[in-house]
Amino acid sequence: AQTSSINAFSPYTMYGIGEQNTPGTLPMRSMGGVGVAMRSSGVVNLLNPAAFSAAPQKSFLFNFGLEGQNYYNSQKVDGMSKSTAYNTFNFHDIAFQLPLAKKLGLGFSLTPYSSVGYRTKYTHDYDPSDPVWGNVGRAQYVYQGEGDVTEVKLGVGWELFKNFSLGIAAQYYWGDIDRSFVMTPTPITGDGSYSSTVGTDNYSISSIKGQIGVQWNAILNQKRALTLGAAYDFGGDLNPT
């Protein structure tokens, strides 16, 4: 078993910016990342800036989240049972929300947006009938990578009129992702000399986007409550360089 501070350990993070984290604070993550319409004076809503207008006067909401995961895999290879375990532990979100004026609130959050973490190994066995590998022998391929993308958001929410709120936020994304590939040949016949092939990719991400959101309390009384919400991100894709 291994332990790491990265937030992912999956071969699927070999592509793009990796595995996207479930957004939101604990109440929203426990519902699978939904909560655009959630409006509460006691919960920081990171999914919709319009919810910042729900901050009660003379209050300060602070949220700090931690996340830990355990990955375990067991399989049979060539009749032999092999297993691996990996533990991850890191912070998930730091956020706060406070009122600026009556029906006007401000929110801030710092959250991991996506994570990359993998190491896979593949061996191409010796095949004497192959015209190429019959001379080279066995070759081992190792692919590995790690990194993450972090999101910081600052927004305001304003209740324009009764039961209808509008919010806008600025989002900044940054991070580094490193990937490498190594091919190591092992001659079987002892003839010839072969060197390893190494390839590396280093990506840096720095991008600014925006978000606009609305919330409407369609029904709000002592017996029932129905809130409709929507949020839209604008500003393009996260393109690594």
Task: Give the ranges of each region predicted by the language model.
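Outer-membrane beta-barrel translocator/receptor signature
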Residues: 26, 38-121
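Outer-membrane beta-barrel porins/channels
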Residues: 2-30, 91-241
